Amino acid sequence: MQILKDQENLNPDGGSFVLITPPLSPPKQKSLSYTNISRRHGMRACMKGIVYEVYKNQPKLWLQQELIWLRRKRIHPIPKARRNNHVGRWANRHSNVSSSSGSRGRSSVSSRDSSPSYSGALRSAERSISSSPSTIEARRRKSARGNGLNGAIDVANLPFEELPNFCPDMSVLDNRTHPRTLKAEWKGPPLDLSDDPYRDLLHPAELHLASTLRLPCLIYLDNKKRIFAEWHHRRQQGLTFRKTDAQRASRVDVNKASRLWKAFHEVGFFDD
């Protein structure tokens, strides 16, 4: 209770009086009101969520109530910065776990490899596998398929002067009864080879083919020589000469190498 003395107001007898007032009470906390929420009545049971409507009518009170509930449950809200980095943190944790597991796996493998018994057994197994006749024969077949020359000559990297000449005689194209000639299709206008200094080394059908593929005469002669050298050596190995083999042996675009292979193949130059 508070006791207040009023010195100015005097009673009729001339004496002062004492004013006694009740204590000040703190303001009561407002509670969320659900009276303004519309309800549906009907003959059947119906449930409707009103959380958003209550929040929309009294957002501040709703937030206070939620914070009180979180404090009671000892649940701390996640700050905004932590929410933004939540996915990245889980990704980093996953990468750390995978890297640690990988390092543990590597350490276990390295420790196992460092043991004398394991390393000795591994070396002996490798020697037995590498020295087996089937493995050696498989390696020979693979190398023969890879470059077509059993590792003896690398057609694609040899200079033009050192390449053996296995090109066929182009005079067979002069035969009027020959059903096919060198033909190819290419986008763009043909290349003018009228002033090429090496045009005399080409057959007229070859000039037409080189012009269509936009290849100068010297580049055409170089790639023709490489293609037929690769074909000859693959035939010696008993292997077929495919379009991809011509692409590996050539020094031009793979599409142009494919057109050259197709033109020579259709004429029958690759027939055994």
Swiss-Prot record:
This is SWIRM domain-containing protein laf2. The modification Phosphothreonine is found at T135. The lineage of its organism: Eukaryota, Fungi, Dikarya, Ascomycota, Taphrinomycotina. Residues 86-148 are annotated as: Disordered. It comes from Schizosaccharomyces pombe (strain 972 / ATCC 24843) (Fission yeast). The gene is laf2. GO terms for biological process: chromatin remodeling; regulation of transcription by RNA polymerase II; transcription initiation-coupled chromatin remodeling. It is found in: Nucleus. Residues 182-272 form the SWIRM domain. The modification Phosphoserine is found at S130, S132. GO terms for molecular function: chromatin binding; DNA binding; transcription coactivator activity. Keywords: Chromatin regulator, Nucleus, Phosphoprotein, Repressor, Transcription, Transcription regulation. It comes from the Eukaryota.
